[in-house]
Amino acid sequence: MNQTIPKWAKSVVVAVALLFAGVAAAADKPNILVIFGDDIGMYNISAYHRGMMGGSTPNIDRIANEGALFTDYYAQQSCTAGRAAFITGQHPFRTGLLTIGMPGAKQGLQPQDPTLAELLKPHGYVSGQFGKNHLGDLDEYLPTNHGFDEFYGNLYHLNAEEEPETYHYPKSEEFHKKFGPRGVIHSYADGRIEDTGPLTRKRMETADDEFRDAAVGFIEKAVEDDKPFFVWLNATRMHVWTRLSPEWDGKTGHGLYADGMAQHDYDIGIVLDKLDELGIADNTIVVYSTDNGAEKITWPDGGTIPFRGEKGTTWEGGFRVPAAVRWP
C-alpha cells in the first residue's frame, strides 16, 4: 500500500520549506492564516459552481479571485484523517489517525508526530488553533501540547457533541463520565486548560462566532507584539448535521446547507476584513480548504458535484475538495 505524503500535504510542506529557505528579519516573515470548513465540497463554493448551484460565497471567492483557485486538490475521506494529514504533512497511516475521533478514545496525535506549529516555532512564530480539532480526546492530544500557544475549540464532530441531548442517550453519570463529550476547551502551552462548558445544540448556533472572535483576538495580539503568526481556524460549518440561529435559518431560500454556508462565508469575511484593518493583508498567506468531501450531493447544495461519491467513500467526491490560496 502506498503510504507517501498526499500531494496537497506535500505542497504545504514545500511551501513552508521555501518560506524559510533564506534567513529573513522577523518583520519579513509572512503571517499564515489557514481556514478550514467542515464537510465542504467544491460546488458548495460559488467560485467553483459559477451560479449553477444555490448559494453564494463572496468572501471565499475573494480569496480565490485575489490568489489561486485549486481544481485538483485532495484531502482525506473523513474529518480526523483530513485534519491529521494537513497539520502533520503525513499520511494518516503513519499517525494512525484514520478514523473519526470519538469521546473517550485513546487515539490522538503522538509526541513524535510533527505539526506545522512545531516547525514554525523555531522561526519566531506564535501559533493558535481555533474551532474543531478532532485529533484526540485526552489532554495530551490537545493542540497546545503539539506546538500551538493557544487553543479554543471543540474536540469532535457535531453529532457526538449533541448526543447527551438525545432521548436515547444513557442517563448514567458513570457512562457520561467515561464516554461523554468534553466541552469547548480553552488551553494554553503553559498547561492551563479550561472547559468552558458543553457544545449544546443551542451553542452550536453561534459557536463559529466564538471561534472566529478568538482567532481575531489572537491575531490582534500577535500584531501588537510584533510577532509573525500561524492561525488555523476550523469552522463547524458546514457539517451535515448542524444547528442554525434564527438569523441565518432561511437566509438564502435554498435550505439549511446554503444557509450555513452563508454564515460560514460571512465569518470568513470578518477575518479577512480584520487583516485589512490591521494593515497586514499583504504580508499574510491565506489558505482556505476543508477536511473531506461533502455529504450533500446535488442541487441546490452542490456538494460533491461533479464527482461520484461523498464523505467516507474512496470515490473522488469523498476527498477531492475546494482549496484557494492568497498571498499578495
Language model features with spans:
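N-terminal secretory signal peptides that target proteins for export/translocation
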Residues: 1-8
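Formylglycine-dependent sulfatase
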Residues: 2, 14-328
